[in-house]
Amino acid sequence: MNNYRRYMQGHLKEVAREEKELEQKAGLAREKAGEIARQLARRFGVTKVCLFGSLATDDFDQFSDIDLAVAGLPEREYLKAYGLAEEIARPFAVDLVLLENAVETLKERVQKEGIVLYDRQGEENSPLKTPDIGNK
């Protein structure tokens, strides 16, 4: 029984360590999402940036990426904006979705679960401030 108890204690410590690492990784991903939103607003004049997906719904895991929905980004600027987002997001992968071109089900998903990182209309999410997306 003693070996089992030691095994369980070690296992629980390992699980706690992994959870802490994952929380730190999610925090870094949120910081990067906020920086991407600020840079898209400054450089491309987007009107809105929303975080959605696992990072917005607290389902973040070791394979998660940063999912961002963007409004007001001209299509001709998409590749430049995506390149910038990709650069900032490293080591995370990033998905950048143009809301104007998104299918209705994706728009509904963003509306339902999304966290607004930047909204030209909203004072609290101005591009000069860090959006509060830490602990949703």
Model-derived features: positions:
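Short gly/ser-rich loop at a beta-strand->alpha-helix junction or flexible surface loop bordering the NTP-binding
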Residues: T47-L55
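Short hydrophobic/aromatic beta-strand micro-patches
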Residues: A69-A71
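Catalytic core of pol beta-like nucleotidyltransferases
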Residues: M1-G45, T57-Q62, L73-K136
